[in-house]
Structures are given as structure tokens and as C-alpha cells.
């Protein structure tokens, strides 16, 4: 979902800046496409101009054994859809096909773009430093037979282009250690060099060192690309009314993304930390019983079954425990003073945009790297646990969580001031003459020349 929203917002940005462009978004239609995705796409169709179209590809799941096979299976459908688009627009007055923008995990679609004789651009939803990291890991894997699993088991450090500090083995991202995900990640990364450029959801002021370290492929840091208008306030009145009653910057918001959940034992430690900290809190709590491959956890039907006995009564007046949360609306609210987060890149960009400090608690994907970058490299976050993995069985104890929350909520900290300053820079990057504004100009010129 996060990739789709960022891609659509990028499409809108391109259309607003270049009136000769039209964009068609092709969406995989498989069993893990949730009602939230369909509702989001429907809302975009209703509000978008005819220059932005959405097409669901045919549902075809026969013989799919991995994510890579899912992508390969879609190639004929993508080709057929693009052929129909170009045939429909084959008159002299109609726009020509100028290129493909493909998701960072869908580089197999470069083959389809090549068949049409047009360039491809990678849409990269993580940060520039992580792209540098992946290119470096791919290089030393291919040239030196680097094994990230062995590196993770050591106390070693890795020198990565784009990072000022040495990268510690303990922060090796979960995705790199996964036998399921590492091979396709490597293959995708190898293919980035075949693209004409990489569009990155970041901005120069946030990742200047990483961006300046790039040589190839060409990059376009055009972010932060966020959907901050559809903030969910109107459909989540109870949550927003509760926040309205809280003092400014007083609430700790705990939210771990669409796939973030904890065991009952870990939930009890978090509850203990929140109670002991004494801070007001809004906690988005998802059921740990994962439904299956790539599916998001659901909300608890009864919170009493997972929370400590008497917890809700003892914290009455300063707490609100919820299921799914309208994260953008909560971060935008003046009562929110800090975010305890899984360190997903979209969440990091949203917290920076609204000037809300983060306490890192990474869980999966590249989030351990993001946590290292935010805490050590950029000094924009505090650490609860930088090397946590949701499949490790580790339990982070109450006192460690409480320390992180107390540090997060310090109102006069230098870190909070740095986040506020970076918030202003994130907004300035998108304004006329700003860094991302200029990079987007360069991208458009490259596309339509």
C-alpha cells in the first residue's frame, strides 16, 4: 500500500508540473490486494483528471511460488495493457509513449519497456542511503562472495559509500538476512543499472552525503512524496476528538505500520513501560496472529485478552488504545509529541514533515538500516531498539522501552530542535527553487526530450 500511495502522489506531482504528460498506473490484482487498496484506488479515480488513469491487471496466480514469480507472471499482462494504451492513442494528435516507471521490486518490467523501445525509471520508496547500501552489498557479494548472514553473526562493521559512520553488523536489515528475500533483492539491485534513472522518495537536505556519493545510475531525489491531504480526520472522529482534549505535544503515539504486531508477552512489556512513564499515549495495537503471506495483521476484537489485567482502568484518562490508526492525521495533530515507530521510510518522512521526533523500533524489511540512519547517521531519532527483528522471539523489557519514551518526550532536547529544523527543510525542498523542485524539473526534461 505504501508503495502505491507514493507512486500515485509522484504521478500527481509530475502531472502538475508538466501538462503534456499523461500517466497510467498498472496495479497487480491478486489475493493480497486488500479492500483498503481498492478503496484508495476508487477514491483516486473519483478525484483525478483524465490524465491519470488506473488499470487493474488480470488476476493470475497459477504456478506462483515466490514474489519473483508473481512479477514474472504479470509481464504478459503489462505488455498487453500497454499495447492497448498505445493503440488507443495511435493518432497523430495523441501523446507518444515516453517511458516506464517501475517499482523498485518490479525490475523485470524493464524487459517489457525494452520491447516497446522506451527507457525505464526505477521508483525507489526507500532512502538514498539504503540504495547506496544495496548497491554496495550487491557489488561485494558478486565480486567478493560477501555473505550477509556471516556478517550479521560477527561484531564487524561495514564501510558503505553514502554513510559517514561505519555500519554495524547488528543493524543488518532483516530483508538482507532472509533466504526468501535476499536473492530477489540482489537481482533487482543488479538491474537498476539498466534503468535511465532512479526516482527516490527523499530530499537533498536530509540525505546530502548519500546523494552526493552517487555516480551511477543517475538519481532524482524528488521527495518527500507524501499523501498529507487524505489524512483521515473526517472518518476517525473519535480518535481526533480525544487528541483535541490533550495538551500540546503531550501524547506518545505508538504505530508500527500495516504489518507490525507483537506477541502477547511483548505487548505486556510495552504496556508496563507506558504506564510507568506516566505520559499520555495513543497506541495502535494489531493482532499478532498473522493471517498469511504479505497479509496485514487485523485488529484485536477484545483488547482485554492481550493487555495486562487492570491496565486500561489504571491508565484511564491518559490513554487511548486503538486498532488501525490514521497516522498522518495523528502526526499532524498538535497534541502529538513523539512517535514510537517501526522505522518504515514513509513513516520517517511523515514524522519529519510534521516535526514529530521518533523512537526507533524496527521490525522487518530495511527498517534496521533506517533506524541506524536516523539515530546514528542523522541524529534525528532516539533508540528503543535498533536491531530488533520481529521474527527473533526477543522480548524488549519494560525499563528499556520506558527509557526510550522518556528520552523521546523531552521537550527541550537538541534532537527535537533538529527535527523541527528538518521539517522546515522538507517543505522548502518542494517549493519553487527548492532542491526537490529542481530535481523534478530535471526528471521531466529527461523524460520528454
UniProtKB/Swiss-Prot annotation:
The active site is at residues 3, 103. InterPro entries: UDP-glycosyltransf_plant, UDP_glucos_trans, UDP_glycos_trans_CS. It comes from the Eukaryota. The keyword Transferase applies. Expressed in cotyledons and roots, but not in leaves. PROSITE patterns: UDPGT (PS00375). Pathway: Pigment biosynthesis; anthocyanin biosynthesis. GO terms for biological process: anthocyanin-containing compound biosynthetic process. Its EC number is 2.4.1.115. UDP-alpha-D-glucose binds at residues 125, 325, 327, 342, 345-347, 350, 366-367. The keyword Glycosyltransferase applies. An anthocyanidin binds at residues 3, 365. Keywords: Glycosyltransferase, Transferase. It holds the Pfam family UDPGT. Disulfide bonds: none annotated. In the presence of other necessary color factors, this glycosylation reaction allows the accumulation of anthocyanin pigments. Belongs to the UDP-glycosyltransferase family. This is Anthocyanidin 3-O-glucosyltransferase 1. It comes from Manihot esculenta.
Amino acid at each position: 500500500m505504501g508503495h502505491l500511495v507514493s507512486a500515485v502522489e509522484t504521478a500527481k506531482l509530475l502531472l502538475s508540473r508538466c501538462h503534456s504528460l499523461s500517466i497510467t498506473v498498472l496495479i497487480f490484482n491478486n489475493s493480497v490486494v486488500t479492500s483498503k487498496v481498492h478503496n484508495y484506488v476508487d477514491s483516486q479515480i473519483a478525484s483525478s483528471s483524465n490524465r491519470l488513469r488506473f488499470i487493474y491487471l488480470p488476476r493470475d496466480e497459477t504456478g506462483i511460488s515466490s514474489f519473483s514469480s508473481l512479477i514474472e507472471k504479470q509481464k504478459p499482462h503489462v505488455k498487453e495493457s500497454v499495447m492497448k494504451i498505445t493503440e488507443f492513442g495511435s493518432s497523430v494528435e495523441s501523446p507518444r509513449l515516453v517511458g516506464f516507471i517501475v517499482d523498485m521490486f518490479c525490475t523485470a518490467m524493464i524487459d517489457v519497456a525494452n520491447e516497446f523501445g522506451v527507457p525505464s525509471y526505477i521508483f525507489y520508496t526507500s532512502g538514498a542511503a539504503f540504495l547506496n547500501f544495496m548497491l554496495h552489498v550487491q557489488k561485494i557479494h558478486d565480486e567478493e562472495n560477501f555473505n550477509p548472514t556471516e556478517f550479521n553473526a560477527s561484531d564487524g562493521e561495514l564501510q558503505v559509500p553514502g554513510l559517514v559512520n561505519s555500519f554495524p553488523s547488528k543493524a543488518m536489515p532483516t530483508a538482507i538476512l532472509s533466504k526468501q528475500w535476499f536473492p530477489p533483492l540482489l537481482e533487482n539491485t543488479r538491474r537498476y543499472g539498466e534503468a535511465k534513472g532512479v526516482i527516490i522518495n527523499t530530499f537533498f537536505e536530509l540525505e546530502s552525503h548519500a546523494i552526493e556519493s552517487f555516480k551511477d545510475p543517475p538519481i532524482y531525489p524528488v521527495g518527500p512524496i507524501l499523501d498529507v491531504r487524505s489524512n483521515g480526520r473526517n472518518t476517525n472522529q473519535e480518535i481526533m476528538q480525544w487528541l483535541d482534549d490533550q495538551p500540546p505535544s503531550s501524547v506518545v503515539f505508538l504505530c508500527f505500520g500495516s504489518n507490525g504486531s507483537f506477541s502477547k508477552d511483548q505487548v505486556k512489556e510495552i504496556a508496563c513501560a507506558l504506564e510507568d512513564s506516566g505520559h499520555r499515549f495513543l497506541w495502535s495495537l494489531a493482532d499478532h496472529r498473522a493471517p498469511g503471506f504479505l497479509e496485514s495483521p487485523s485488529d484485536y476484537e477484545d483488547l482485554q485478552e492481550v493487555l495486562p489485567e487492570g491496565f486500561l482502568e489504571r491508565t484511564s484518562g491518559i490513554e487511548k488504545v486503538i486498532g488501525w490508526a490514521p497516522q498522518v492525521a495523528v502526526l499532524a495533530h498538535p497534541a502529538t509529541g513523539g512517535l514510537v515507530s517501526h522505522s518504515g521510510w514513509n513513516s520517517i518522512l511523515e514524522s519529519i514533515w510534521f516535526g514529530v521526533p521518533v523512537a526507533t523500533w524496527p521490525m522487518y524489511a530495511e527498517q534496521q538500516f533506517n533506524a541506524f540512519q536516523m539515530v546514528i547517521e542523522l541524529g534525528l531519532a532516539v533508540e528503543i531498539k535498533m536491531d530488533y527483528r520481529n521474527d527473533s522471539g526477543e522480548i524488549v523489557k519494560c525499563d528499556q522501552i520506558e527509557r526510550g519514551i522518556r528520552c523521546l518526550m523531552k521537550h527541550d532536547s537538541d534532537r527535537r530542535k533538529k527535527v523541527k529544523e528538518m521539517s522546515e527543510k522538507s517543505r522548502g525542498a518542494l517549493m519553487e527553487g527548492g532542491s526537490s523542485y529542481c530535481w523534478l524539473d530535471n526528471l521531466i526534461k529527461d523524460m520528454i526530450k
